[in-house]
Design a protein with these regions (language model features):
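Short helix-loop-beta junction
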Residues: 236-249, 340
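Catalytic His-Asp segment of secreted/periplasmic serine-dependent ester chemistry enzymes
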Residues: 268, 313-396
Length: 396
């Protein structure tokens, strides 16, 4: 083959190769966004069953740490992570399990006022596990948004549906015009590394500082939030909206045991009322041993703050499991005896909530017999509300 013929054959091939290389270079340097991954499972058939939609462009982002959260106490003390429930010093005094659980952001609420037509949130989660077998990602790792209506009542707006550890999504769009107050509840069983609220550029926005004198709940996995469908459906959150008061959630899954080390932090809070709801993690012996010392510990530092003692809920299948029914009977009797003993000592400002109907009496209030579903949380709030109302009235 002559050199002239070789040149004629090779020239088209070289041109094609150059075009391919140029196309590859353009693909690597293009600023066009990558296509979103195709939805899987049922979300292919019903988009409302998929993850939240991504955040829009042209937003102004507001870092929530610049004005603070409700449910985050001891703000003047150093923290290992800004969104931890306890300050760093607690790691040396509480149990390892309580410390690890305290890194979940349950009970924290960010409040703000805006006239935005849409609201977005960008947050990074501490843990990659977004949900649990008996609790959805919306509850474990979601951000749950409420707003005040024209009557000043809190009403639900929307919740994120996370499917990644970093969430940057639109919570709600097409909002009715007007300036209104919002409250966003942080995840129940995950921690938060950072969080910002996004609104369209030009929208009015004001971060609202945390309110004082919260209702303080100390309890177990149920107080922690298991198994609410979303963060605003836990009974401390429900009661906070009903009373329009801030709440501190010190629920520690499997580890709410009336620990004196936790009590040392409780007494540092200028609370409107303390709710002690630890029996689901305790037996009769522990209840007898620890109830009175914890109450005395609180009373020593907070002589006038009401204290509410709560019996544990009954397993919703204890009607057919005699051993569980007997355990609840004995646990309740132990708390009742401790309560009556404290009254005889002259301790004032004590209140008592019975546990038999915390979940109702139809067996439908729990996800797994032990942990509340949304119905169970609403029922707990209904039972607790009148007692808390009386306690709050007495403390004013």
């Amino acid at each position: 083959m002559t050199s002239s013929l070789l040149r004629r054959v090779a020239a088209p091939l070289l041109s094609l190769l150059a075009l391919a290389l140029a196309g590859s270079l353009v693909a690597q340097t293009s600023s066009a966004p990558a296509a979103a991954p195709a939805p899987s499972g049922v979300a292919r058939l019903d988009p409302t069953m998929g993850a939240s939609q991504g955040a829009a462009a042209a937003l102004t982002w507001h870092d929530v740490t610049t004005w603070g959260l409700e449910g985050r106490e001891w703000t003047e003390r150093p923290r290992l992570r800004w969104f931890d429930r306890f300050p760093a010093e607690a790691q040396k005094t509480v149990t390892d399990k309580v410390w690890n659980l305290s890194r979940d952001s349950t009970g924290m609420v960010v409040r703000f006022r805006t006239d935005a037509s849409s609201i977005h949130v960008h947050y990074k989660l501490m843990k990659a596990q977004l949900g649990m077998p008996h609790m959805p990602a919306t509850g474990v790792s979601g951000v749950d948004l409420y707003a005040r209506n024209t009557k000043g009542e809190w009403r639900w707006v929307g919740v994120t549906r996370p499917d990644t550890q970093e969430v940057k999504v639109e919570i709600i769009k097409d909002l009715a015009p007007g300036l209104r107050e919002y409250a966003a509840y942080l995840p129940l069983y995950n921690g938060v590394e950072s969080m910002s609220i996004g609104v369209p550029a030009g929208a009015a926005f004001e971060g609202l500082a945390p309110r004082k004198r919260p209702i303080v709940f100390y309890g177990t996995s149920i107080t922690h939030g298991a198994c609410a469908s979303r963060p605003g459906m836990v009974h401390p959150a429900i009661l906070g909206r009903r009373f329009d008061l801030p709440v501190v959630n010190l629920g520690f899954s499997g580890n709410g045991r009336m620990d004196a080390a936790v009590g040392a932090f409780l007494v540092d809070i200028d609370a409107a009322v303390y709710v002690i709801d630890c029996l689901p993690n305790m037996g009769p012996g522990g209840v007898t041993e620890r109830t009175a010392p914890l109450v005395r510990q609180i009373r020593k530092s907070r002589p006038n703050t009401p204290i509410v003692l709560v019996e544990d809920r009954r397993y919703t299948n204890d009607w057919i499991t005699p051993g569980k029914a007997k355990f609840h009977d004995e646990n309740h009797a132990a708390l009742r005896a401790a309560y009556e003993g404290l009254l005889q000592e002259g301790v004032k400002g004590l209140y008592y909530i019975e546990g038999d109907r915390l979940y109702g009496d139809d067996t439908e209030g729990a996800t797994d017999a032990s942990h509340a579903n949304d119905l169970g949380f609403m029922r707990q709030a209904d039972v607790m509300e009148p007692v808390l109302r009386a306690a709050l009235a007495a403390s004013r």
